Protein backbone atom coordinates (compact mmCIF):
# COMPACT_ATOMS: atom_id res chain seq x y z
CA UNK A 1 0.00 0.00 0.00
CA UNK A 2 2.95 2.31 0.67
CA UNK A 3 6.29 1.91 -1.06
CA UNK A 4 9.28 4.07 -0.12
CA UNK A 5 12.37 3.80 -2.31
CA UNK A 6 15.82 5.38 -1.72
CA UNK A 7 14.32 8.25 0.25
CA UNK A 8 16.77 10.89 1.46
CA UNK A 9 16.28 14.27 3.12
CA UNK A 10 18.79 16.76 4.43
CA UNK A 11 18.35 20.10 6.22
CA UNK A 12 21.56 22.07 5.76
CA UNK A 13 24.33 19.79 6.98
CA UNK A 14 21.95 17.56 8.94
CA UNK A 15 21.03 14.29 7.25
CA UNK A 16 17.52 13.37 8.43
CA UNK A 17 16.79 10.41 6.13
CA UNK A 18 19.35 8.40 4.15
CA UNK A 19 18.42 5.88 1.44
CA UNK A 20 15.30 4.64 3.23
CA UNK A 21 13.57 1.66 1.58
CA UNK A 22 10.26 0.44 3.04
CA UNK A 23 7.16 -1.50 2.02
CA UNK A 24 3.98 -1.28 4.08
CA UNK A 25 1.20 -3.77 3.24
CA UNK A 26 -2.52 -4.27 3.89
CA UNK A 27 -3.29 -5.61 7.33
CA UNK A 28 -0.03 -4.39 8.82
CA UNK A 29 0.03 -2.27 11.94
CA UNK A 30 3.50 -0.79 11.96
CA UNK A 31 5.21 0.64 15.03
CA UNK A 32 7.46 3.37 13.62
CA UNK A 33 9.85 4.02 16.48
CA UNK A 34 13.31 5.35 17.24
CA UNK A 35 15.09 8.02 19.29
CA UNK A 36 14.23 11.70 18.98
CA UNK A 37 15.73 13.06 15.78
CA UNK A 38 15.84 9.66 14.09
CA UNK A 39 13.71 10.79 11.14
CA UNK A 40 10.27 9.42 12.07
CA UNK A 41 8.37 12.68 11.68
CA UNK A 42 10.16 13.57 8.44
CA UNK A 43 9.31 10.14 7.01
CA UNK A 44 5.63 10.54 7.92
CA UNK A 45 5.47 14.08 6.55
CA UNK A 46 7.17 12.91 3.35
CA UNK A 47 4.50 10.23 2.88
CA UNK A 48 1.80 12.86 3.49
CA UNK A 49 3.38 15.27 1.01
CA UNK A 50 4.13 17.84 3.71
CA UNK A 51 7.89 17.50 3.22
CA UNK A 52 9.56 17.21 -0.19
CA UNK A 53 12.44 14.72 -0.06
CA UNK A 54 15.73 15.49 -1.79
CA UNK A 55 15.89 12.07 -3.43
CA UNK A 56 13.77 8.96 -3.76
CA UNK A 57 10.23 7.97 -4.61
CA UNK A 58 7.07 7.30 -2.61
CA UNK A 59 4.09 5.39 -3.99
CA UNK A 60 0.75 5.01 -2.23
CA UNK A 61 -1.54 2.31 -3.60
CA UNK A 62 0.58 2.23 -6.74
CA UNK A 63 0.42 5.98 -7.39
CA UNK A 64 3.50 8.22 -7.35
CA UNK A 65 2.61 10.91 -4.81
CA UNK A 66 4.40 13.62 -6.81
CA UNK A 67 2.04 13.19 -9.76
CA UNK A 68 -1.13 11.94 -8.02
CA UNK A 69 -2.09 14.41 -5.25
CA UNK A 70 -5.50 12.79 -4.70
CA UNK A 71 -3.79 9.85 -2.97
CA UNK A 72 -4.24 11.68 0.34
CA UNK A 73 -7.97 10.99 0.25
CA UNK A 74 -7.15 7.40 1.19
CA UNK A 75 -5.13 8.44 4.26
CA UNK A 76 -6.42 9.33 7.71
CA UNK A 77 -3.85 11.29 9.72
CA UNK A 78 -3.71 12.10 13.41
CA UNK A 79 -0.86 14.54 14.11
CA UNK A 80 1.03 14.63 17.38
CA UNK A 81 -0.20 18.18 18.02
CA UNK A 82 -3.48 19.33 16.51
CA UNK A 83 -3.52 23.02 15.66
CA UNK A 84 -7.23 23.72 15.34
CA UNK A 85 -8.70 27.22 14.81
CA UNK A 86 -9.33 28.22 18.41
CA UNK A 87 -12.60 30.10 17.85
CA UNK A 88 -14.16 27.38 15.69
CA UNK A 89 -16.66 25.05 17.33
CA UNK A 90 -16.13 21.30 17.19
CA UNK A 91 -19.25 20.77 15.07
CA UNK A 92 -18.06 23.46 12.64
CA UNK A 93 -14.77 21.62 12.19
CA UNK A 94 -16.55 18.42 11.17
CA UNK A 95 -18.83 20.42 8.86
CA UNK A 96 -15.78 22.02 7.27
CA UNK A 97 -14.27 18.61 6.58
CA UNK A 98 -17.58 17.50 5.06
CA UNK A 99 -17.58 20.56 2.80
CA UNK A 100 -14.02 19.88 1.67
CA UNK A 101 -14.90 16.27 0.80
CA UNK A 102 -18.23 17.14 -0.84
CA UNK A 103 -18.76 15.46 -4.18
CA UNK A 104 -16.83 12.30 -3.35
CA UNK A 105 -19.20 9.44 -4.10
CA UNK A 106 -19.56 6.13 -2.31
CA UNK A 107 -17.77 7.04 0.92
CA UNK A 108 -19.44 5.81 4.08
CA UNK A 109 -18.43 7.85 7.10
CA UNK A 110 -17.07 6.11 10.18
CA UNK A 111 -18.69 7.72 13.22
CA UNK A 112 -17.67 5.07 15.74
CA UNK A 113 -15.03 7.14 17.53
CA UNK A 114 -17.21 10.24 17.35
CA UNK A 115 -19.88 8.27 19.18
CA UNK A 116 -17.59 6.31 21.52
CA UNK A 117 -15.87 9.51 22.66
CA UNK A 118 -19.30 11.20 22.99
CA UNK A 119 -18.12 14.17 20.97
CA UNK A 120 -21.73 15.37 20.67
CA UNK A 121 -21.50 16.66 24.23
CA UNK A 122 -18.66 19.04 23.26
CA UNK A 123 -19.89 19.79 19.73
CA UNK A 124 -20.74 23.43 20.52
CA UNK A 125 -17.53 24.12 22.41
CA UNK A 126 -14.80 26.22 20.87
CA UNK A 127 -11.78 24.13 19.96
CA UNK A 128 -9.55 26.50 21.90
CA UNK A 129 -11.52 25.75 25.08
CA UNK A 130 -10.95 21.99 24.91
CA UNK A 131 -8.55 20.14 27.17
CA UNK A 132 -5.60 18.34 25.62
CA UNK A 133 -7.36 14.99 25.96
CA UNK A 134 -10.52 16.29 24.28
CA UNK A 135 -8.48 17.64 21.37
CA UNK A 136 -6.90 14.20 21.01
CA UNK A 137 -10.36 12.64 20.90
CA UNK A 138 -11.47 15.04 18.17
CA UNK A 139 -8.26 14.46 16.21
CA UNK A 140 -8.63 10.67 16.45
CA UNK A 141 -12.28 10.80 15.36
CA UNK A 142 -11.28 12.92 12.34
CA UNK A 143 -8.51 10.48 11.36
CA UNK A 144 -11.05 7.65 10.94
CA UNK A 145 -13.99 9.84 9.84
CA UNK A 146 -13.85 9.11 6.10
CA UNK A 147 -13.09 5.39 6.41
CA UNK A 148 -9.52 5.57 5.04
CA UNK A 149 -7.61 2.55 3.82
CA UNK A 150 -4.43 3.90 5.43
CA UNK A 151 -4.27 5.41 8.92
CA UNK A 152 -1.19 7.27 10.19
CA UNK A 153 -1.20 8.09 13.90
CA UNK A 154 1.54 10.21 15.51
CA UNK A 155 1.63 9.71 19.30
CA UNK A 156 -2.12 8.94 19.32
CA UNK A 157 -2.51 7.97 22.98
CA UNK A 158 -0.66 10.97 24.42
CA UNK A 159 -3.01 12.89 26.69
CA UNK A 160 -5.85 10.37 26.51
CA UNK A 161 -7.48 9.12 29.68
CA UNK A 162 -7.34 5.33 30.28
CA UNK A 163 -10.87 4.67 28.96
CA UNK A 164 -10.31 6.69 25.77
CA UNK A 165 -6.94 4.99 25.34
CA UNK A 166 -8.59 1.56 25.35
CA UNK A 167 -11.33 2.74 22.97
CA UNK A 168 -8.74 3.96 20.48
CA UNK A 169 -6.65 0.79 20.70
CA UNK A 170 -9.75 -1.35 20.11
CA UNK A 171 -10.57 0.79 17.07
CA UNK A 172 -7.07 0.33 15.66
CA UNK A 173 -7.30 -3.43 16.07
CA UNK A 174 -10.66 -3.48 14.26
CA UNK A 175 -9.08 -1.65 11.34
CA UNK A 176 -6.26 -4.19 11.16
CA UNK A 177 -8.81 -7.02 11.05
CA UNK A 178 -10.44 -5.27 8.07
CA UNK A 179 -7.14 -5.29 6.19
CA UNK A 180 -6.35 -1.60 6.62
CA UNK A 181 -2.78 -0.35 6.98
CA UNK A 182 -2.00 1.42 10.26
CA UNK A 183 1.27 3.24 10.97
CA UNK A 184 1.79 4.38 14.58
CA UNK A 185 4.54 6.36 16.25
CA UNK A 186 4.69 6.42 20.03
CA UNK A 187 7.13 6.69 22.89
CA UNK A 188 4.73 4.56 24.97
CA UNK A 189 5.91 1.16 23.78
CA UNK A 190 3.55 -0.70 26.11
CA UNK A 191 0.63 0.64 24.04
CA UNK A 192 2.24 -0.61 20.83
CA UNK A 193 2.41 -4.16 22.21
CA UNK A 194 -1.38 -4.35 21.91
CA UNK A 195 -1.88 -2.79 18.48
CA UNK A 196 1.16 -3.49 16.28
CA UNK A 197 2.33 -6.55 14.38
CA UNK A 198 5.40 -5.04 12.73
CA UNK A 199 8.27 -2.79 13.80
CA UNK A 200 10.36 -0.28 11.87
CA UNK A 201 13.12 1.20 14.03
CA UNK A 202 14.85 4.30 12.69
CA UNK A 203 18.20 5.53 13.93
CA UNK A 204 20.09 8.51 12.51
CA UNK A 205 17.88 8.54 9.44
CA UNK A 206 18.47 4.90 8.52
CA UNK A 207 16.50 1.69 8.97
CA UNK A 208 17.98 -0.06 11.98
CA UNK A 209 15.32 -2.78 12.13
CA UNK A 210 12.40 -3.81 9.91
CA UNK A 211 10.69 -7.01 11.07
CA UNK A 212 7.47 -8.52 12.34
CA UNK A 213 6.80 -8.60 16.07
CA UNK A 214 6.72 -12.41 15.90
CA UNK A 215 10.15 -12.51 14.26
CA UNK A 216 11.67 -10.17 16.84
CA UNK A 217 10.09 -12.12 19.70
CA UNK A 218 11.55 -15.34 18.29
CA UNK A 219 15.04 -13.80 17.98
CA UNK A 220 15.09 -12.23 21.43
CA UNK A 221 12.92 -14.55 23.51
CA UNK A 222 11.09 -11.48 24.82
CA UNK A 223 7.36 -10.77 24.71
CA UNK A 224 7.31 -7.02 25.41
CA UNK A 225 8.35 -4.60 22.69
CA UNK A 226 10.54 -2.41 24.90
CA UNK A 227 12.50 -5.47 26.07
CA UNK A 228 12.78 -6.74 22.49
CA UNK A 229 14.29 -3.45 21.34
CA UNK A 230 16.77 -3.31 24.23
CA UNK A 231 17.86 -6.91 23.61
CA UNK A 232 18.36 -6.36 19.87
CA UNK A 233 20.39 -3.19 20.41
CA UNK A 234 22.53 -4.92 23.05
CA UNK A 235 23.12 -7.88 20.73
CA UNK A 236 24.05 -5.65 17.81
CA UNK A 237 26.43 -3.56 19.92
CA UNK A 238 28.13 -6.68 21.26
CA UNK A 239 28.67 -7.93 17.70
CA UNK A 240 30.42 -4.72 16.61
Sequence positions of predicted segments:
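Helix-to-loop junction immediately C-terminal to a conserved catalytic motif
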Residues: 48
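Conserved structural motif at the start of ABC-family nucleotide-binding domains
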Residues: 2, 17-19
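Conserved ABC ATPase "signature" region
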Residues: 95, 105-122
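The feature captures the beta-strand-to-loop junction immediately N-terminal to the Walker
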Residues: 33-35
